[in-house]
Amino acid sequence: NCHVEYEKTNRARKHRPCLYDPSQVCFTEHTQSQAAWLCAKPYKVICIFVSFLSFDYKLVQKVCPDYNFQSEHPYFG
């Protein structure tokens, strides 16, 4: 019932001195992706994926819309 209408990915990588040894070089990397689907109902579903990675830290997060937002009949699926 759905197809991808829009897709985009941004990446950034920065070098900096390492926290555990400032004489060494470490990096941080950031990636952000966005996609939009057009569905038959018709309505759009947009999810954003955010990830952050460094030597001692990693974060991956998925953000999606509230299906109940501005809906006559709330979605409980």
Swiss-Prot record:
The scientific name of the source species is: Macaca mulatta (Rhesus macaque)
Q: What superkingdom does the record give? A: Eukaryota
Record-stated family? Belongs to the neurexophilin family.
User: Which InterPro entries does the record match to this protein?
Assistant: Nxph (IPR010450), NXPH/NXPE (IPR026845)
Name the UniProt key words of this record, in alphabetical order.
Secreted
Q: Secreted as a keyword?
A: yes
What span is annotated as the signal peptide, if there is one? none
- Where do the record's region annotations for V (Cys-rich) lie? 1-77
Q: Which GO terms describe its cellular component?
A: extracellular region
Q: Does the keyword Secreted apply?
A: yes
Which Pfam families does UniProt cross-reference here? Neurexophilin
Q: Which gene encodes it?
A: NXPH4
Q: How is it modified after translation?
A: May be proteolytically processed at the boundary between the N-terminal non-conserved and the central conserved domain in neuron-like cells.
Q: Quote the subcellular location field of this record.
A: Secreted
Role noted for this protein: May be signaling molecules that resemble neuropeptides and that act by binding to alpha-neurexins and possibly other receptors.
Q: What is this protein called?
A: Neurexophilin-4
